[in-house]
Amino acid sequence: MYKNLIKILIVTLFTLIPNLSIASAEISKIINNYNINVIFLRHAIAPGYGDPNNFKLGDCNTQRNLNFEGIEQAKMIGNYFRINKIKFSEILSSEWCRCLDTISNMDIGKWKEFEGLNSFFQNYSDKSLVTKLLYKKLNTIKDEELILMVTHQVVIAQITGISPSSGGMVLYSTLNGKSKNIVINYK
């Protein structure tokens, strides 16, 4: 009896709270059930906060970068997508080194840098330009596509209202603007 009550409460909470985190979710079912066509992925673990004052785009020595744990996390994320047979129509990444290193270490296919995913947290990129480019891209995504976007917490929050942790995913539908924060144990 209590097990059924708990199940009902969980289902009710999931229905009432659209951005509820889901541990070890069956991502393919969620993608299909919620018409998801974008997966926003926050870069893997890069210790620290923001970027150094001498930040220069394209120069990883002037940026906050992945540590060993972040590199391993990126590899596990890539393995997760492969194991779950999740294929992407397109893979895009912020031009920041920690995002490029995340997607490189995931090793899931060809990808392109996209200015519309760059961080505007410390004004190293123009927020209005980044947002304009990203919305323009989102408006061109077809219903049947699935696009992976490797980016930053501020960019994901700007679009979805959700702030994922490093290596966290937010599933997003351009059809209805709904999003789901997904917490996965990649191990």
Task: Give the ranges of each region predicted by the language model.
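Generic beta-sheet signal
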Residues: I36-I39, E145-T151
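A short, structured loop/turn motif at beta-sheet edges
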Residues: N139-E145, T174
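Short, well-ordered beta-to-alpha junction loops that form the rim of enzyme active sites
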Residues: S93-W96, V150-V154
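Sec/Tat signal peptide C-region and signal peptidase I cleavage site
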Residues: N19-S24
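Short, surface-exposed amphipathic charged segments that create phosphate/polyanion-binding patches used
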Residues: S125-K132
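Active-site-proximal alpha-helix that buttresses catalytic centers in soluble enzyme cores
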Residues: A25-E115, F120-N123, I162-K180, I184-K187
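Bacterial N-terminal signal peptides
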Residues: I8-I17
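Bacterial N-terminal signal peptides that target proteins for export
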Residues: M1-L9
